[in-house]
Amino acid sequence: MGLRKASAYSKKHVMPYTRISRKKGKAFIKVVPPQKIVKFSMGNEQVFREGKFPYHYTVLADENCQIRHNSLEACRQYINKQLETGFAGQYFFRVIPFPHHIQRENKMLTGAGSDRMQTGMQLSFGKSIGKAALVKKGAEIFFVA
């Protein structure tokens, strides 16, 4: 099954669900989805720390939003590929937000007789399906040097 549309998770003032405990009964989130972002820093970090890159570029958020970890990973792959083909190791690129917020889905059945099999909105906490980074307006998302 594919991803739900972004408007299902478009709340700007959302309560972050991150409670994970070693004791399963005390944890709000029973299963944590795996992290899709493989690397957060790419390129030549040593040259960046020495201060040899004269220009810096930062992508900022226009509004409060949730950014899914798979969309951050897709942007990371695209930007890193473009930088690698254009500058070949003479750059430094960093993904700044870390997806902590665990997104949930209360699956609903459709079709004949489905009302007898599901509970509706009783016990509607949902199962975890992905992670997201809660980003505030003006926060940095990507950094390129």
Protein language model regions, located:
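Ribosome-associated RNA-binding proteins
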Residues: 1-145
